[in-house]
Amino acid sequence: FYHYGTSREMISSTLSIQNLVYDQRRIMHLGVKPHPSIFIQNALCKTALTEQNSNTWIENSCVGEHWQLHGSNIITGVPENDWHVDLPLGVCLDMVPIDTPLPNAYALRPYGMHDAFRGDITLPDTTYMGVSMSEWASLRGVNLEDIQPQADLQAARIFPISQDMKALERMLNWMVSNAGDVEAREMWLKAPKVCANELSDQANLRRLQAQREDFRSQNLTALAANHRRSVFYQTNLDDMA
């Protein structure tokens, strides 16, 4: 039984399903995947990954050459970009296409691998991206009481919406690592925001699927060109039959 419940369980269950070959001599090309718990699908990944990037999941996303990932990162929904991003250990990112209140916009939702997403955001034991939510806000000069008093984290409108990819890049880095960026703070304060509860209601699933199909098409072209090293061309057809 494989349970796709929490973020960590999604990776651990997929790892259990996929790692069925224990005799490394049966794998024609070793070293293609630097760690068994790295999963990339329907995505463009241009940054170098190593064995330090365990528990990494990239789906329907563009991770450019200027991205730095440190392990235990889940990245979903990120459109093509040329961003410079430093995603710390255990920090994840979901981007959701939204057309309200701005058309052709994206909501930016960074979160922690182990976030429970519950609890009053003003209480010290409510965590966000691995730290107290109140500490996260204090480091960034944000007064949570001014934004949404006594909100549960799941219902707190902290995820900014923008049509501007450069603004989204700036706000992302401010939210996950560069807490001292004053201009990014102002962008975040002025931007319309949604909560986790609202994302599923407002997501434009057609845009999300169109992006996935575009990435998949690019992946299939790359797989065909890389047939000498692709695991799909190693399939034993007798076993499959």
Q: Can you describe what each PLM-predicted range is?
A:
Residues 1-241:
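Left-handed beta-helix
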